[in-house]
Each structure stands twice: as C-alpha cells, then as structure tokens.
Design a protein with these regions (language model features):
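Cross-family detector of peptidyl-prolyl cis-trans isomerase
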Residues: 1-128
Length: 128
C-alpha cells in the first residue's frame, strides 16, 4: 500500500473511501476475497476511464480485453500504481486521480485535456 497518512471517510457502511496525501481518492466498491496486489506483482484488470464531466475516454470492456501491467513499475500513470495496490482479486475500486498523478499539464493523445482529473473504475481480475 501507499505509505503516508491516509484519511478515511465512511459515508456508507459498505463503501470505504480513502484520500491519500497525494490527492488520490480511492473508493472500494467491492472488496475482493482473493490475493492482494502489491508492488512487483503483474496485475490483470478491467477498467473504464472518464473525465470529470462524464465523458468516457477509454474502456477495456469495449475491447473485451483485460489490461496487464507490473504494479509499482512505472508502466502506468502514478494514480494507477498507487490506487491498484492493496486491491484483492475480485475487487472493484473507483479511483479519482488528480492531474499530477495522471497525465499532468501535457494531457494525452488529444483525448485527455491538460490538467484533467480522471475517474476510473478498476476491477482486479488476476495477479501473478
């Protein structure tokens, strides 16, 4: 898990929301019951990403293909490395990622504007 102080907010007894000092918001929608993802694991996820105005910009579901990456290896945006750590297989999280942990002031591919906060639903399918 990300080290540092965390603030826990419980608005619903079935949902847990954490705000990490970096500004990343993590909301467990489903807490899985499988193995827990940690740095160094190869993780397999399904995800959908939106801008804060509700515009969907990407989804692995639309391609019917999961996405795999090495957790903590810098292969993805920092918000994903921090936000997927600690998930358990079968779990689902909503990640609200500030621009500094996403694509920053450069944006991405004409799809994500500069300075954009990103919202992802991430489901942990597997790990090795």
């Amino acid at each position: 898990m990300q080290s540092g102080v965390r603030e826990q907010q419980l608005s619903d007894p079935f949902l847990q929301k954490e705000v990490i000092m970096s500004g990343l918001e993590i909301e467990d929608q489903i807490v899985g019951d499988g193995d827990e993802a940690a740095a160094g694991h190869a993780v397999e996820v399904h995800y959908t990403g939106w801008l804060t105005d509700g515009t969907k910009f990407d989804s692995s579901h639309d391609r019917n293909q999961t996405f795999s990456f090495k957790l903590g290896g810098g292969q993805v945006i920092a918000g994903w490395d921090q936000g997927v750590a600690g998930m358990k297989i079968g779990g689902s999280r909503k990640l609200t990622i500030p621009a500094e942990l996403g694509y920053g002031e450069r944006g991405a591919g004409g799809v994500i504007p500069p300075g954009a906060t990103l919202v992802f639903k991430v489901e942990l399918i597997g790990l090795s």
